[in-house]
Amino acid sequence: QGLIAFPRV
């Protein structure tokens, strides 16, 4: 499980 919940778009 990574820390990135919302990838930068």
From Swiss-Prot:
Protein's name in the database: Periviscerokinin-1
What cellular component terms from Gene Ontology apply here?
A: extracellular region
The record's keywords, sorted A to Z, are:
Amidation, Neuropeptide, Pyrrolidone carboxylic acid, Secreted
Q: Tell me which InterPro entries the record gives.
A: Periviscerokinin
- Highest taxon in the source lineage: Eukaryota
- Valine amide-modified residues are 9
Keyword 4Fe-4S, does the record have it? no
Q: Which family does the UniProt entry place this protein in?
A: Belongs to the periviscerokinin family.
Biological processes, Gene Ontology terms: neuropeptide signaling pathway
- Residue numbers carrying Pyrrolidone carboxylic acid: 1
Subcellular location field:
Secreted
**Where mainly located?**
secreted
What this chain does, per the record? Mediates visceral muscle contractile activity (myotropic activity).
Q: List the disulfide bonds.
A: none
Q: Which organism is it from?
A: Chroicoptera sp. (strain Kasungu)
Q: Is Zinc-finger given among the entry's keywords?
A: no
